[in-house]
Amino acid sequence: MRAAPPTSLQALIEALKVLPGVGPKSAQRMAYHLLQHDREGARKLGDALRGAVDGIRHCTRCNTFTELEICGTCSDPERDATLLCVVETPADQVMIEQTLTYRGQYFVLMGRLSPLDGIGPKEIHLDRLLARATDPELGGPASEVIVATNFTSEGEATAHYIGEMLKARGLKVSRLARGVPVGGELEYVDAGTIARAVMDRRTL
């Protein structure tokens, strides 16, 4: 009879497999490393995960991650509330912030349209985006909406859908310039390239 790992160890391995790019072997290596060489690090990791899961929420205005009802970017009086940049993820927002060239606000979709995966307009909060872009109580109407979804097929489809939706309301909509490679994701593009793509954006 083959010996099985302890139940709690197996549970740890299964939990680690939820991380992107982590398969069974990698998860097993991580679990054994933490238990064998870095139990204090494992405790810190567990505490940090619990703190983030319990303490992080979505900003009621832009949908990004925050510990407050309204995030620091949305509550910053020095940001241009009428200039709105739409991104897929909080990581994409961070990349644009690192360019130090954009002083508007954001809306974070938390995904992109993917009908085959059951992800439609509702799942990426396009109703909230429309409200943010048009409702004066939320900072609207926007003077310009920059669609900064990734240049993947799903990202392009999402950009087209958002562009048509907002232009139908009379809003100016622009798209990042093609400095970002086709198929590229903002999270993996250098800040200089993103800065140029924002500055050279084209009107849809």
Curated annotation (Swiss-Prot):
SUPFAM superfamilies the record matches? Recombination protein RecR (SSF111304)
NCBIfam families, per this entry? recR
Q: List zinc finger spans: C4-type.
A: 59-74
Give the Toprim domain ranges.
82-181
Q: Does the keyword Aminoacyl-tRNA synthetase apply?
A: no
Keyword hit for ATP-binding: no
Q: Could you tell me what this protein is called?
A: Recombination protein RecR
Q: Coding gene? A: recR
Membership in a protein family: Belongs to the RecR family.
Q: What does this protein do?
A: May play a role in DNA repair. It seems to be involved in an RecBC-independent recombinational process of DNA repair. It may act with RecF and RecO.
| Keyword annotations of the record | DNA damage, DNA recombination, DNA repair, Metal-binding, Zinc, Zinc-finger
List, alphabetically, the HAMAP family matched: RecR
Q: Name one GO biological process term.
A: DNA recombination
State the CDD domains in the record. TOPRIM_recR (cd01025)
Give an example GO molecular function: zinc ion binding
Query: Which top-rank group of organisms is this from?
Result: Bacteria
Q: Which InterPro entries match?
A: DNA_Rcmb_RecR, Rcmb_RecR, Rcmb_RecR_Znf, TOPRIM_dom, TOPRIM_RecR
